[in-house]
């Protein structure tokens, strides 16, 4: 049974439509490496095919440290209580990682677009998160190592980047300037 009061790694695929690879990789890490003792909460996403969801739920039922849900309308609470995050790196998820200040490993999608890869690469260069690239081998030990590494990874707030989360105040300043023009 999942205990939200104990440390956990939140694994999120965003909508889930293309998240099966990430979920499978994390599950294989837990299936092969019992030393991964931090519990994992997998959020499959509402757009993941139901056949894939069923298969993952079946596998999850055999791994004590892993729990899965399809969707939660209060993802913010899951982020808030998570101690670590593994995600694909979509824009909204990345903003939540920054806002909730969570150590994160991003496993970006590279097909059909490089958007997540570009975001993950730059975030890693800045020290905001780490990145694990899908090399098509998806070795369980690579994912296990990435999850374990999050324990020693600083949260994004440890890196001071002026203006990083100042979008709202910047927009307000621009609107105020426009509003004061004759």
Where are these regions (language model features)?
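Donor-nucleotide binding loops and adjacent catalytic segments primarily
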Residues: 2-84, 136
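A donor-sugar binding/catalytic signature common to diverse glycosyltransferases
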Residues: 74-118
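C-terminal amphipathic helix plus adjacent low-complexity
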Residues: 142-182
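Hydrophobic residues at beta-strand termini and immediately following loops
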Residues: 69, 107, 132-133
């Amino acid at each position: 049974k999942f205990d939200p009061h104990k440390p956990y790694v939140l694994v999120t695929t965003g909508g889930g439509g293309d998240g099966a690879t990430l979920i499978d990789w994390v599950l294989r890490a837990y299936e092969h490496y019992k030393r991964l003792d931090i519990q994992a909460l997998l959020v499959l996403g509402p757009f993941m095919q139901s056949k894939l969801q069923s298969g993952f739920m079946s596998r999850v039922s055999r791994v004590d440290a892993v729990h899965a849900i399809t969707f939660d309308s209060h993802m913010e609470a899951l982020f808030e209580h998570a101690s670590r995050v593994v995600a694909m790196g979509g824009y909204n998820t990345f903003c939540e990682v920054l806002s909730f200040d969570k150590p994160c490993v991003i496993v970006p999608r590279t097909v059909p677009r490089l958007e997540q890869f570009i975001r993950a690469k730059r975030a890693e260069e800045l020290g905001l998160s780490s990145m694990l690239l899908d090399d098509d081998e998806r070795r369980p030990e690579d994912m296990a190592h990435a999850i374990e590494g999050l324990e020693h990874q600083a949260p994004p707030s440890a890196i001071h980047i002026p203006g990083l989360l100042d979008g709202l105040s910047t927009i307000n300043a621009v609107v105020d300037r426009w509003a004061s023009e004759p």
